């Protein structure tokens, strides 16, 4: 059976370390770090994600600023809220929970966030810094993947690595981070011809396709490392539908590949907790810069 890349355990260890650093600073009279999460509308999945982030903030000792706006809020109303948070001296990180309701331009709103408070690493300036391998907030999911690989002592340098998916949230920044770690990276997507021809060569395969159980045994190389970024709520039994209940799954058919690959992330409990952990790391890193602190977080940053 493949080694489990346990993101839940590692995320817990990161939270404890952040909590320790924060507690030491609070004893010296420094204000706590603050993270503001803007949620627009009542998307059920977004509610769960925001709740998880708020709980993680409490565990780490980060002050959470919740901001819930109505689904029919205008671009200007959301923009004004971001501008207020930009000037709030108690807020070190700002996250705009995606997806937004139809009709709102997420890209334009992300540009309104102060790049120094960009907790999700999605501001154009910070994506440019990633491209140039300069210091700045990093996209949380790929940063979490890099931390998970490092913690499990998985060698990246020189490895044939394939990333499935080219989104600005995961695929593109993931490829850049792997390249910076000296992997040989191929980025594939929905228009790629002969997907299996690429994935079968991957010593490290990162799957961020957004399609439930897309990848199976026929796609993977023996003894490879598989990182499953996807998480989906699907019927336990397609024939029974709602009556049969639901289950969570990823983009990979794990039961098929578990005895064939060397390591794999579980779903849930793999990449998801690491995404939240890196959100906290970005926030605390911004906090130390705003408060002119010297924390030893370098090994947590990709």
UniProtKB/Swiss-Prot annotation:
Keyword Manganese: no
CDD domains per the UniProt record, alphabetical: NAD_bind_m-THF_DH_Cyclohyd
Name by which UniProt lists this protein: Bifunctional protein FolD
EC number(s) from the headed UniProt entry: 1.5.1.5, 3.5.4.9
GO biological process: L-histidine biosynthetic process; methionine biosynthetic process; purine nucleotide biosynthetic process; tetrahydrofolate interconversion
Pfam family, one: THF_DHG_CYH
Gene name per UniProt: folD
One GO CC term, this protein: cytosol
Chain's role: Catalyzes the oxidation of 5,10-methylenetetrahydrofolate to 5,10-methenyltetrahydrofolate and then the hydrolysis of 5,10-methenyltetrahydrofolate to 10-formyltetrahydrofolate.
Keywords: Amino-acid biosynthesis, Histidine biosynthesis, Hydrolase, Methionine biosynthesis, Multifunctional enzyme, NADP, One-carbon metabolism, Oxidoreductase, Purine biosynthesis
Family statement: Belongs to the tetrahydrofolate dehydrogenase/cyclohydrolase family.
Lineage: Bacteria, Bacillati, Cyanobacteriota, Cyanophyceae, Synechococcales
Pathway(s) per entry: One-carbon metabolism; tetrahydrofolate interconversion
Subunit structure: Homodimer.
Alphabetized GO MF terms: methenyltetrahydrofolate cyclohydrolase activity; methylenetetrahydrofolate dehydrogenase (NADP+) activity
């Amino acid at each position: 059976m493949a080694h489990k890349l346990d993101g839940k355990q590692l995320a817990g260890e990161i939270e404890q370390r952040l909590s320790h650093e924060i507690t030491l600073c609070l004893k010296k009279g420094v204000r706590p770090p603050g993270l503001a999460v803007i949620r627009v509308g009542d998307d059920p999945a977004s509610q769960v994600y925001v709740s998880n982030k708020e709980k993680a903030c409490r565990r780490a000792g980060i002050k959470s600023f919740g901001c819930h706006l109505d689904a029919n809020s205008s671009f200007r109303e959301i923009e004004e809220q971001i501008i207020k948070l930009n000037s709030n001296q108690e807020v070190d990180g700002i996250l705009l929970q995606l997806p937004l309701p139809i009709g709102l331009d997420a890209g334009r709103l992300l540009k309104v966030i102060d790049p120094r408070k960009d907790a999700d690493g999605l501001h154009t300036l910070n994506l440019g810094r990633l491209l140039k391998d300069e210091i700045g907030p990093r996209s949380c999911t790929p940063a979490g993947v890099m931390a998970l690989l490092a913690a499990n002592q998985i060698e990246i340098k020189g490895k044939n690595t394939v990333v499935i998916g080219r989104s600005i949230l995961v695929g593109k920044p993931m490829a850049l981070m792997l390249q910076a770690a000296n992997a040989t990276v191929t980025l594939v997507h929905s228009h790629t011809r002969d997907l299996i021809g690429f994935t079968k060569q991957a010593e490290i395969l990162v799957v961020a396709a957004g399609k439930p159980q897309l990848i199976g045994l026929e796609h993977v190389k023996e003894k490879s490392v598989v990182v499953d970024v996807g998480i989906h709520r699907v019927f336990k039994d397609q024939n029974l539908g709602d009556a049969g209940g639901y289950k969570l799954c990823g983009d990979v058919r794990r039961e098929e590949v578990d005895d064939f690959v060397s390591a794999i992330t579980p779903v849930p409990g793999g990449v998801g907790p690491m995404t939240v952990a890196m959100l906290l790391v970005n926030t605390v890193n911004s906090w130390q810069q705003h408060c002119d602190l010297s924390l030893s977080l370098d090994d947590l940053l990709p």
